[in-house]
Amino acid sequence: LGEICAVGEGEPAPEISLSVAPEGEGWRLQVNAEDFQFSKELAGLYHVPGMGHGHIYVGGVKLGRLYEPEVHIGALPQGTHEVRVTLNTNDHRAYVVDGTPVTAAISIKVD
């Protein structure tokens, strides 16, 4: 995870879930985040509670950052692939609520 940002009492406590649907040759991933605002403008700058960006991983490999709640994932080879998203602060620390990283995963099965 690297550096973390433990959410303090009274601060927004982000939650996350994922959904995925076929889209063309690939997939449309929807990130459903509560108490969290995606912000490209402040990425790499100062921390604002409840604000930041996501990191997306497929099969444990980081694909990049998410600055909005939807992303297209290109075609995947046959098999089952785990897609994971973490929520991170503007200054790139991983959000942690009650000792647990704010992350969600979903599997994509390609026949």
Give short role names for the model-derived ranges.
Residues 98-111:
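Short beta-strand elements
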Residues 27-31, 77-90:
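Short, well-structured beta-strand segments within conserved domains
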